[in-house]
Amino acid sequence: MEIFPISLKLQQQRCLIVGGGHIAYRKAILLVKAGAILDIVAPDIDPQLMSLIEQSAGTAYVKLFEDHDLDRVYRLVIAATDNADVNKRVFEQAELRNLLVNSVDDIPNCRFMVPAIIDRSPLLISVASNGASPVLSRQLRTQIETLVPHGMGKLAEFSGQWRSRVKAQITNPDERRIFWEELYASPLKEQVFNDNLDIANQMMTQSLAEWTAPKGEVYLVGAGPGDPELLTLKALRLMQQADVVIYDRLVSAPILELCRRDAEKVYVGKARSNHSVPQEGINALLVKYAQAGKRVCRLKGGDPFIFGRGGEEIQELFAAGIPFQVVPGITAASGCSAYAGIPLTHRDYAQSVRFLTGHLKEGSPELPWSELVYENQTLVLYMGLVGLEHICQQLIAHGQRPDMPVALVSKGTTPEQKVVVGTLSNIASKIAEYQIHAPTLTIIGEVVSLREQLQWL
């Protein structure tokens, strides 16, 4: 994030625009709407702009810009002339005086940028691109305009009228936030939109009278293999309402960014033989936070019920009498194979697929080898990188062809995805050669040969 978005109160604050044409007029409208006192410095001032100056009780200085014009006390300054040299000079002089300054469409000479705005006062939504693409910002604003009802401003104003009373009655900030979230999902919203304020006030009074502190709950959420666009809608909704997010090493940073920003985030990362928090500790954390009345999102890479130890966690929750939800995620086998261009089943090559873990409880991959050498079958190994050489040797020893195709998909579905293809006889030697690191999925079977034709990334 290269810029820090803020909302600036400008009521009765004196602001300066240097420039008197249509560029200045566009910015002046926004400043006057925000309640600013508007001064203009320009040799020629558009009549419409002059009326805005009068409306705001500001001053028109009909002259060329001079450095001392900034010696007056201004909250912010906008350079809006069609002369780049003048705009740069305004910027430099404002910087010397530590004034917030914007040069219209001239990013190097800006201390702040004016975003595209969706106005549902008192609710405001802004879209900014750090000056990289104002047109894109405006297009996004147009899309958002269609999604946000005009009545949202009324709802924000209505909420403001009740805010003090709600705060006085529900003193716990987390509980208060849940109260408002539930209220905004209730029929009250439509009553406010339709100006039925008497009914809305009655509903508010009743909601406060009936309010009880919520019980804690755990959401066991599959985050998928890494690409945030592979999240389910339900996963995203629960991630954004959770008070606490307990996440592991396989949850990618872009996915974690989608969680509620003010949620407490607890890292319990797991790597082979290096668990920052052991499974028993994770189970205890889930119970502790839920018993404290928190909504807890246990965020897991892939799917929580496929080699994710989700079953163990909800057994603990069940024993403690804690309510929970389970949200499936796209498992690594599905996501990584698709992004690698390797179908796990194909009528000509594989009529079945088996998911296996190469990292067993005792630390050694002892698998039913004779069952794994059937024809027309795809094997998918999770956590099999360390024991891959042993696995390949055992498959060959139990009758599998040494030239059976194998693919390693490292960090699948992410921008760092790497795919290495080999055979049972040589794939282990390629790990060091291509610097393959966990998390890596191993796919064994004739379907791997289709990658050459079907890869799309």
Curated annotation (Swiss-Prot):
Protein name, per record: Siroheme synthase
Role played: Then it catalyzes the NAD-dependent ring dehydrogenation of precorrin-2 to yield sirohydrochlorin. Finally, it catalyzes the ferrochelation of sirohydrochlorin to yield siroheme.
Reactions listed under catalytic activity: uroporphyrinogen III + 2 S-adenosyl-L-methionine = precorrin-2 + 2 S-adenosyl-L-homocysteine + H(+); precorrin-2 + NAD(+) = sirohydrochlorin + NADH + 2 H(+); siroheme + 2 H(+) = sirohydrochlorin + Fe(2+)
SUPFAM superfamilies: NAD(P)-binding Rossmann-fold domains, Siroheme synthase middle domains-like, Tetrapyrrole methylase
Residues engaged in binding NAD(+): H22, I23, P43, D44
Pfam family, one: TP_methylase
Known pathway: Cofactor biosynthesis; adenosylcobalamin biosynthesis; precorrin-2 from uroporphyrinogen III: step 1/1; Cofactor biosynthesis; adenosylcobalamin biosynthesis; sirohydrochlorin from precorrin-2: step 1/1; Porphyrin-containing compound metabolism; siroheme biosynthesis; precorrin-2 from uroporphyrinogen III: step 1/1; Porphyrin-containing compound metabolism; siroheme biosynthesis; siroheme from sirohydrochlorin: step 1/1
GO terms assigned for molecular function: NAD binding; precorrin-2 dehydrogenase activity; sirohydrochlorin ferrochelatase activity; uroporphyrin-III C-methyltransferase activity
EC id: 2.1.1.107, 1.3.1.76, 4.99.1.4
Entry-linked PANTHER family: SIROHEME SYNTHASE, SIROHEME SYNTHASE-RELATED
Oxidoreductase in keyword set: yes
InterPro entries: 4pyrrol_Mease, 4pyrrol_Methylase_sf, 4pyrrole_Mease_sub1, 4pyrrole_Mease_sub2, CobA/CysG_C, NAD(P)-bd_dom_sf, Siro_Cobalamin_biosynth, Sirohaem_synt_dimer_dom_sf
Region (Precorrin-2 dehydrogenase /sirohydrochlorin ferrochelatase) residue spans: 1-204
GO biological process terms held by the UniProt record: cobalamin biosynthetic process; methylation; siroheme biosynthetic process
Region (Uroporphyrinogen-III C-methyltransferase): 216-457
Keywords: Cobalamin biosynthesis, Lyase, Methyltransferase, Multifunctional enzyme, NAD, Oxidoreductase, Phosphoprotein, Porphyrin biosynthesis, S-adenosyl-L-methionine, Transferase
Top-level taxonomy: Bacteria, Pseudomonadati, Pseudomonadota, Gammaproteobacteria, Moraxellales
Family: In the N-terminal section; belongs to the precorrin-2 dehydrogenase / sirohydrochlorin ferrochelatase family. In the C-terminal section; belongs to the precorrin methyltransferase family.
Residue numbers annotated as active site: D248, K270
NCBIfam families membership: cobA_cysG_Cterm, cysG_Nterm, PRK06136.1, PRK10637.1
Sequence positions bearing Phosphoserine: S129
Binding, S-adenosyl-L-methionine: P225, G301, G302, D303, I306, T331, A332, M383, G412
Cystines in this chain: none
Keyword Ion transport carried by entry: no
